[in-house]
Amino acid sequence: MNNYETVFILTPVLSDAQMKEAVEKFTNLLKAQGAEIVNEENWGLRKLAYPIDKKTTGFYQLVEFKADPSVIATLELNFRRDERVIRFLTFRQDKYAAEYAAKRRNLKSSKETVKENN
């Protein structure tokens, strides 16, 4: 199983419930295919670098997971078929990128615990 990271952008016209439902659809698809979700981050509504389909903002979502290479084709096919997804990018992490992502997650979680204690 390889480490993968995917970032996808959802259309900005979605409500919070619709956005969460779309994210849940893709994470459940990964789990059904035997992938292990390592990390999920909602980056929120952000400005796009350039307009896509006359939209200038979008909801960014990051998902890190471990899966077999065959899962990626299924995931990307579902991204292409879903009208809510504006763009997506999936790439395989090498061992250095996986280590960096783990350190970043640990640093982020330690900052959150410090904020909770204050």
UniProtKB/Swiss-Prot annotation:
What GO biological process terms does the UniProt entry carry, in alphabetical order?
A: translation
* GO CC list: cytoplasm; ribonucleoprotein complex; ribosome
Q: Which GO terms describe its molecular function?
A: small ribosomal subunit rRNA binding; structural constituent of ribosome
Establish whether keyword Ribosomal protein is in the entry.
yes
Q: Which InterPro entries match?
A: Ribosomal_bS6, Ribosomal_bS6_sf, Ribosomal_S6_plastid/chlpt, Transl_elong_EF1B/ribsomal_bS6
Family matches, as SUPFAM superfamilies: Ribosomal protein S6
Membrane-spanning intervals of the chain: none
Keywords linked to the UniProt accession:
Ribonucleoprotein, Ribosomal protein, RNA-binding, rRNA-binding
Can you tell me which family this protein belongs to? Belongs to the bacterial ribosomal protein bS6 family.
Cross-referenced NCBIfam families = S6
- Functional description taken from the UniProt entry: Binds together with bS18 to 16S ribosomal RNA.
Q: What is this protein called?
A: Small ribosomal subunit protein bS6
